Structure formats: structure tokens, C-alpha cells
Amino acid sequence: MMSFDIKCRPEFALLTVEVPEGKKLFVEASAMAWMSANMKMRALFKGGLRRFISKESLFISEFEAQGFAGEVAIAPGPSGDIGHLSLNNQTVYISSSSYVAHTEGVSYETKFQRLSQGLLSGAGWFLIKMVGTGDVWFNSYGALESLDVSDNLTIDNGHIVAFTEGVEYDIVRLGGYKSLLFSGEGFVCKFRGQGKVFIQTKKPASLISWANAYRPVKSSRA
């Protein structure tokens, strides 16, 4: 486990990780705020061309401490908190927009979950499967909450940040297409099993919808 600190939480969380000499830290692309002079950085591309086209690829940055231990400070894009899990030969699934960083010993793969056929064909939910032993960090838009899944739990897709192994889910449309078009409610995840789901109290789609109402609109002239 790497030593780390999370400051400025919960609204504007900043993650600082101490990377031991010779060790590597993997971070969301472009999220590095600052780093020690001895840190070597290189870009990685996971997934290949086919997955890039289908949006299943993942861009990350690799940081390696050379000569002695160094630090990397990470500032995720959304305004919110940062969560941490220490995996011990375990699995966690993270929404792609919530991934922040992970250490060596944890492998990852991407999964594109299609939400529908027809009206929203092509829309989907991009998950990152993290497996192994090490540290994993993820961020939220708004506050971060942990919910226990002991039986069944229904959560709006836009609020899901991550969930642990032991939890299964089905993606369903809530209330049919009329609800999707007129109420703003769309797809939800129905979780079952035993485990935890991490949610965010805000979702980007709601912010976009709210801001759109104040968008200047040019009046048409006859």
C-alpha cells in the first residue's frame, strides 16, 4: 500500500501519493497537478484501435520514481470527493468517468455496456474492471456515499461511481420511453447480491440540463 493523503475534501479533493523508488503509479490522463522532479512520466494506451473506435479504450499516465521516493499530486476534473479501496486479490468495477489512479499489482480491463437498442442505440456505460492486490482511487461529482447491497437496490446510472465484487446488476429503462423523453428519467441499474455501491450526489447530465435552460437563444426574424 502506498502512502497517500486526500486534501481539500469533499468539494475539491486533491490526492497526493508517495511513490517508493522504482515503483509505478498509474493515473487518469491529464489529471496530474504536480510531481517531484525525479518522477518519470509516460503515456499509456489500453485497448487498441478497435476498442478506441468503440470507446472501450483507456488513456492513462504512468509515473515511476527514479533514484528515490517521489510524490504525485492528482486533481480530477469534477468538483467532488475522492474515494480509496485497498484490494487484496479482489475486484472492483469503476465508472470510466470516475477513475483516478491505481498501483502496481492491480490489472485493469475495459467494458462497454450498451444501454439500449433503438431510440438510444449507441449509448452506453463504460466500466473499468480492476483486479488484484493494491490501491485504487476514484472520484465523485459532488459528495461520495457508500451503500450496502444486501438484497436489491435500484440506482440511477448517472449516480454510480463504483461497486465491489459480489454484486450483480441489470440495466433497465425506467418507466418506458415517455419517462425518458418527458420526465428526464432514463436508465437505472438494479443491483443484487452482497457488496457495496459507491454513488455521487450529483450527475453531469443534470448540470447540463439545468444550464441549458439559461442558454442564450437567438430570436428568428421574419
Language-model features and meaning:
Residues 1-222:
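Composition-driven recognition of glycine/serine/threonine/acidic- and proline-rich low-complexity segments
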